[in-house]
Regions:
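Thiamine diphosphate
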Residues: 1-124, 131, ...
């Protein structure tokens, strides 16, 4: 489901599939981090809820360097309501030591992966189901400054703050306002 088959084939000795045991996945990643590794743990956003206790006590309170990739964040209509990842931002924001990120495109996803791994603390990267928007990716991802938004377009009347795939929608709205009303709208990628 998470599309990691190619990664499993490329590095089978570094790939662990725990099945539908999200608590175990988080605890395994915590154990690896305690042992000096920098694990990346891929879980559907909605099913990360099952591992809330180990996320708090075994990863975040210990400030362990685990990077979580939360697939199907937001609405996931083709999978049905049980797979909508709607609550992760609200329940992760109240946990100390973690970073929550959501890329606007696949290039920024690479930057966020680098940021998560290099930050040496719990990092949560959420993204929707499906393919990216088709932007060209850098050969060498660049770590992002944590907590700093990206101003994509400057205006004077108002601003639209967006995150993830909604950044493209915000840019489209800003373009429509410019075309129809001659109004420049600021668009900010909250990241």
């Amino acid at each position: 489901g998470t599309g990691l088959d190619a990664l499993h084939k490329a590095i089978p000795e570094r790939f662990f599939d725990v099945g539908i045991a999200e608590e175990h996945a988080v605890l395994l990643a915590a154990g690896m981090a305690t042992g000096g590794k920098l694990p990346v743990c891929a879980i559907y956003s909605t099913f990360l809820q099952r591992a809330y206790d180990p996320i708090i006590h075994d990863v975040c309170l210990q400030n362990l360097p685990v990077t979580f990739c939360l697939d199907r964040a937001g609405l996931s209509p083709n999978d049905g309501p049980t797979h909508h990842g709607l609550f992760d931002i609200s329940y992760l924001r109240c946990i100390p030591n973690g970073i929550i990120m959501q890329p606007k495109d696949e290039d920024e996803l690479q930057d966020m992966m680098t940021t998560g791994i290099e930050s040496k603390c719990p990092a949560f990267i959420r993204y929707p189901r499906g393919e990216g928007v088709g932007v060209e990716r850098k050969k060498n991802p660049i770590p992002l400054e944590v907590g700093k938004a990206e101003v994509l377009r400057k205006g004077s009347l108002c601003a639209i703050w967006a995150i993830g795939d909604f950044v493209q929608i915000a840019l489209s709205i800003a373009n429509q306002f410019k075309k129809k009303y001659g109004i420049e709208i600021t668009v900010v990628n909250a990241r």
